[in-house]
Design a protein with these regions (language model features):
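N-terminal Sec-pathway targeting helices
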Residues: 1-12, 524-530
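Transmembrane signal-anchor helices characteristic of membrane glycosylation enzymes that use polyprenol
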Residues: 15-29
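Alpha-helical transmembrane segments of integral membrane proteins
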Residues: 17, 336-619
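Soluble extramembrane regions of membrane proteins in the secretory/endomembrane system
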Residues: 28-320, 672-680, 684-698
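Extracytosolic and intramembrane catalytic regions of membrane-associated proteins
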Residues: 68, 72-109, 141-142, 219-222, ...
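A broad structural signal for short, well-ordered beta-strand segments within beta-sheet-rich domains
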Residues: 114, 189, 480-481, 642, ...
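Alpha-helical transmembrane segments of integral membrane proteins, especially early/N-terminal helices
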Residues: 251, 287-295, 325-328, 357-365
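Juxtamembrane/start-of-transmembrane alpha-helix segments at the extracytoplasmic/lumenal side
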Residues: 313-332, 388-395
């Protein structure tokens, strides 16, 4: 028996207990040491390889000398394992935009009992220009090497195993495009396991799979000790700008799984993505995902990949999965359970309908309260930090503001319905959402189906027990709700950050709805007064305290623009958050301004005029051939060993295609941003290389004006003081600092 006066306290206690249990069961496994048996995966062995690969602790983008050095070290590691390998060196470009490079992919083979199809293990070995790349994607590379060592001991398997270490992933999946579109072995691959990383910690999860994934998911769950992943992430990933090499695999209609982690995201694409910062538990989880799964897949038939499955796990350590086509049946089962429960409980259908109407009010007040709190945080401080170095003010603000909003919703609802009516109304509203999600977002259906079936079953049982014991069953409806709502928040906090607080608040709102009937006995006015004071305190602390640390710095890039024709030079400090001292003192211009000659509408903030770099711009030699089409042959060089050369051609230039080496590419017209209205050709990894580029134009096109740029991460020496001050609690990110020299040319 649970007295109503204690019900709310028990519900809150149970919420924290269930959240803690779910959080504990989804942590990555402990790393295994050097004494681990040879046929098992050891994160320590893998980490030792990573330390030798990245001994310089410096970035190694495509085309750089250090990237080639690391490639040679990878060859040495494969030689130590006795695994034959080859190199693919070719020009290639991205699919979505013309970002091109001469890539150097590594392909290694562990022979099988048959010649094909291959099981491929894939990761990329290049980094962005600002990060050493231990997490992205050094951890994936060494996980494959350590797994390959163990696989080699037991080979041959039925299927041969291929290792693909791609180059130039960071500039648009270019290495993967080169392999899957140009290499003859690509057609011999049956399954790909891609391994990625984003940040420096977190569980290695199934990020996404190919469409027909029954064989893959069943093998994964059967063979892996700590399976982790939710199919709803596929729905999120479809709508995000992020990408991995697995996208190329999908476009090639090859089956597979994309594994990734996303913890400590402040380190992602920054100088903090180091060997010292990478969590060995994450590497261990990578290995425990791919090694046993590879052994299984390499040993079974792949004639039938089965149906499309949705999946979710771990939920308190348990994995759930079923055919996507079953989701509607399970939704109907939940409907039957709830209808029977309503009938047996003799609850008022009319009042339950009112409870349905109250449900979106509770969700809305919870979500709106959280939005208002973080809007005020942004208003007072000028920023919301994605991953603050000091987290507790943001976390308290999230908890207290949503609790405040949720209780406001409860106070409104209990004026119209009682506890039982609200309980049934809440789950009927959840059921409506379940059908909508099942139809429109099928990969996320299990997130809603599991809680409503569980609740429907408990509510039906409650109609057969004594009144004194019903409250226990009502409490237990929280058991399946927590992992599907609050249990996902920590992962979203780590992967999306507080700038995308909108990804978290709906989950909090849904849980507020489910727990709301259990809070009807609270003295809400007094409690909300206390919660309001906590919210205000967290808001003020979060607004007026410096929350940046060296481990979680503010991301700020330094951009230097020089128009070589006009003689104008500018410096811009680029950050998603408001600048603070001492960097703000370098900016003396308040109005936004166009800093490049080719785009008068793209305005930049946080800029100031600057001295010339005294650098020489890129060199150009051209040869024009007129025939059926106009062919222009260009030889391009950077006179300062810049990493990138960029060619801009206006949309009316008549450009139809271009060649790099023997590879023909289609130009892509930029439709937004700095390069809007231009065909943009990015030539990456140039440095001291001379690039021959052939451009095909419509035959009737005369000479056209274009822009040629070379871009380096090295800044002019007169910016040394600014560069020095941009350290400590500041850090570059992604492509980082850019020195851009621009000149107009005729073609």
């Amino acid at each position: 028996m649970v007295h109503k006066n204690y019900l709310s306290a028990l519900a809150i206690f149970l919420t924290f207990a269930l959240f803690s249990l779910q959080h504990f069961t989804t942590q990555p496994p402990s790393p295994k040491g050097l004494d681990t048996p040879e046929n098992e995966f050891s994160a320590v062995r893998a980490h030792n390889i990573l330390k030798s690969l990245l001994i310089e602790n410096k970035p190694h983008p495509v085309g750089s000398d250090l990237n080639r050095t690391i490639k040679e070290r990878l060859k040495d590691e494969l030689d130590k394992l006795g695994i034959q390998h080859q190199e693919q060196k070719t020009w290639a470009c991205a699919t979505r935009f013309a970002s091109c490079a001469e890539v150097e992919n590594l392909i290694a083979i562990i022979p099988g009992e048959t010649k094909s199809p291959y099981l491929a293990l894939m990761a990329h070995y290049d980094s962005v220009p600002m990060a050493p790349g231990a997490g992205d994607d050094g951890a994936g590379v060494v996980a494959i090497l350590e797994a390959a060592r163990a696989l080699k001991l037991e080979a041959p398997f039925k299927h041969p195993i291929m290792i693909i270490l791609t180059d130039a992933e960071e500039i648009g999946l270019v290495g993967a495009e080169a392999f899957f579109n140009q290499h003859p072995l690509a057609k011999e691959i049956g399954i790909v396991l891609n391994i990625e990383g984003s940040g420096s910690s977190g569980s290695s999860m199934v990020l996404r799979t190919s469409k027909k994934n029954e064989l893959l998911i069943k093998s994964y769950v059967h063979e892996t000790a700590r399976p982790y992943g939710f199919s709803f992430v596929k729905e999120i990933f479809k709508r995000m700008p992020n990408d991995t090499d697995f996208s190329v695999v999908n476009r090639s209609n090859i089956a597979g799984i994309d594994f990734a982690f996303a913890g400590e995201r402040n380190h992602y694409h920054t100088p903090n993505d180091t060997v010292d910062n990478i969590d060995l538990r994450t590497i261990q989880h990578h290995g425990e995902n791919i090694l046993p799964l590879s052994k299984n897949l390499a040993s079974v038939d792949w004639d039938d990949m089965g149906d499309e499955f949705i999946y979710g796990g771990e939920i308190y350590g348990f994995w759930t999965q079923w055919k996507t086509s079953y989701s509607l049946i399970f939704s109907l089962l939940a409907t039957l359970l709830l209808m029977l429960a309503i009938f047996k409980s003799k609850v008022s259908v009319k009042k339950s309908a009112v409870g349905i109407l109250m449900s979106p009010i509770i969700v809305s007040t919870t979500v709106l309260s959280g939005f208002i709190a973080f809007y005020l945080l942004s208003f007072l401080s000028g920023k919301v930090i994605s991953w603050p170095g000091i987290e507790w003010p943001y976390r308290i603000l999230l908890i207290s503001s949503t609790a405040l909003g949720g209780l406001i919703g409860v106070s409104i609802a209990r004026k119209f319905v009682n506890q039982i009516e609200m309980l049934f109304g809440a789950w009927l509203f959840w059921l409506i959402l379940t059908f909508l999600i099942t139809i429109y977002l099928p990969d996320a259906a299990n997130t809603f189906i599991l809680p409503v079936i569980f609740a429907g079953f408990l509510l039906l049982i409650s109609s057969f027990v004594k009144e004194d014991n019903k409250q226990i069953l009502f409490l237990l409806t929280l058991v399946m709700s927590v992992p599907m709502t609050l249990g996902l928040i920590f992962s979203l906090e780590q992967s999306q950050g507080y700038k995308l607080i909108g990804a978290v608040l709906p989950l909090v709102g849904l849980y507020a709805l489910i727990i709301s009937p259990l809070l009807f006995s609270l003295k809400i006015k007094l409690i909300n007064l206390c919660i309001g004071l906590v919210t205000i305190s967290a808001l003020l602390i979060g607004s007026y305290t410096n929350l940046y640390t060296e481990d979680r710095p503010q991301h700020v890039n330094i951009y230097f623009y020089e128009d070589l024709d006009a003689g104008n030079s500018y410096v811009q400090l680029s950050s998603q958050e408001s600048l603070i001292e001492p960097l703000v003192s370098y900016i003396n211009e308040e109005k936004a301004k166009a800093l490049v000659p080719f785009s008068g509408e793209y305005l930049s903030e946080n800029w100031t005029q600057s001295a010339s770099s005294e650098w020489q711009g890129p060199s150009l030699e051209k040869q024009i051939e007129l025939g059926e089409n106009k062919l222009v042959k260009l030889k391009l060089n950077s006179n300062r060993s810049a990493s990138r050369i960029v060619l801009l051609l206006p949309k009316d230039s008549g450009l139809t295609s271009f060649y790099l080496g023997s590879v023909k590419m289609k130009p892509v017209l930029s439709s937004w941003g700095l390069y809007e209205g231009y065909y943009v050709i990015y030539l990456n990894g140039i440095y001291n290389k001379e690039v021959e580029l052939k451009l095909n134009f419509d035959a009737n096109k005369s000479e056209v004006s274009a822009y040629l740029m070379d871009i380096s991460t090295k800044l002019p020496s007169h910016l040394d003081e600014l560069y020095k001050d941009r350290s400590g609690i500041f850090s570059p990110v992604h492509r980082g600092d850019q020195a851009i020299l621009i000149k107009k040319i005729s073609i």
